[in-house]
Amino acid sequence: MSSNVIKNNDEVIANKSKALLKRIPTKKNRKQVENALEYSIKMHEGQVRKSGLPFVSHCIDVANILIDWNMDHTTVVSALLHDVVEDTEVKLSDIEEEFGSDVASLVDGVTKVENIAFRSKEHKQAENFTKLFLSLARDLRVIIIKFADRLNNMETIQYLSSNKRQEIALETKEIFVPLAHRLGMAKLKWQLEDLSLKCLDLRAFNSIKKKIETSTRLNEDILSNAIRPIKSELSSYKIKSNIFGRYKSISSIHRKIENRGKKFEDIYDLYAIRIVVD
């Protein structure tokens, strides 16, 4: 690797690290995250992703996803270290000594899920995997870290070979999507579904994406007009609520087209409204 690439990568990691630390609200938590960052950078030194970026960039991205999901700082610290035991000479006892038993437990959980569930052919079937995954991940935060890890890997999957992309996308579709649905993580479910479809059937993905972007049936006014009377009715009964509206995901529309044998123009349920009451 040339000195210019190394210098650029160092700058990327430095900038990513600064941006991450700015998102940590308290001084105490920020110091713990900073320690984990420095440790991860040191231990992953020399390891490079297929994108050409240092491996630790992935760890930082996963930590940022978890902050987006409002996870606690212990989970964020664990995310920065989630591949250290798996991919370096560091032992779990080292993590416990340096960062405490809670972080070590989460890192251990992620490592076990990766080693046992993902690398065993007998567990590749979705139902078998789900049962094993849930039994291994006794702390829900292990699953959440693994979800964030998979989301980032899917977001950067373009750097892998075609065969590897297909394999990971299919695994995501058959295992992670149903698991996200089972745990009520609706947004993550459709994010992973869309990213999987993009890998498995790019032509269909781009076709539907283009039609969504150009369709006169999809606009914010229609969505707002649908939400307004619902909000008004709930307010009249003094029911506290949050109402979220969005367009149906590309993968959801694709599924309707495939299952019903219809064209995009014949699909009318293009919006989704979620009502959360207090």
List the model feature ranges, each with a label.
Residues 1-272, 277-278:
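Active-site helical microenvironments for divalent-metal-assisted chemistry
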